[in-house]
Swiss-Prot record:
Pfam families: SPOUT_MTase. The keyword Kinase does not apply. Keywords: Cytoplasm, Methyltransferase, rRNA processing, S-adenosyl-L-methionine, Transferase. This is Ribosomal RNA large subunit methyltransferase H. It comes from Pseudomonas entomophila (strain L48).
Length: 155
């Protein structure tokens, strides 16, 4: 099974890359966790933000192949407990399609991305910094895998 985090934003601090890779490498080879970065469009004082978000959304969707699952991370998505995420991970594994977890830029996801989403997931009702979200997703996917595999990491 292949899980991809498609996220707007690049050139993250080293601690973000290290945190992401720490959890990605802990997963078994049959559960590949990949990161695809979409460059954040420059937002100037007079920028047409709606157009920039639409362009970022198009770039995100261009990374998704037909038939792949899209799961958007949204403030108004469904909150999952660790056990619920483990259940979703197991269903995704049985479905055998690539799963694309979509994280938008500072203003969120393009409506076109949300419209293609099969599931909407909320990490928290809090506003979280995007660099931290990457690590949090990696850790939670790893934790969900440990629940499914009986690993003692999740106690």
């Amino acid at each position: 099974m292949r899980l991809r985090l498609i996220a707007v934003g690049s050139r993250m601090p080293k601690w973000v890359e290290e945190g992401w890779h720490e959890y990605a490498k802990r997963l078994p080879s049959e559960l590949a966790l990949e990161l695809v970065e979409i460059p954040l469009n420059t937002r100037g004082k007079n920028a047409d933000v709606a157009r920039l978000i639409r362009q970022e959304g198009e770039a995100m969707l261009s990374k998704v192949q037909p038939g792949e699952r899209i799961v958007t991370l949204e403030v108004h998505g469904k909150p999952w407990s660790t056990e619920q995420l483990a259940g979703e991970l197991d269903r995704w594994r049985l479905d055998a399609r690539t799963v694309n977890l979509m994280v938008g830029g500072p203003e969120g996801l393009a409506p076109e991305v949300c419209a293609r989403s099969e599931q909407r997931w909320s990490l928290s009702p809090l506003t979280l910094p995007h660099p931290l979200v990457r690590i949090l997703i990696g850790e939670q996917i790893y934790r969900a895998w440990t629940v499914l595999s009986g690993h003692p990491y999740h106690k």
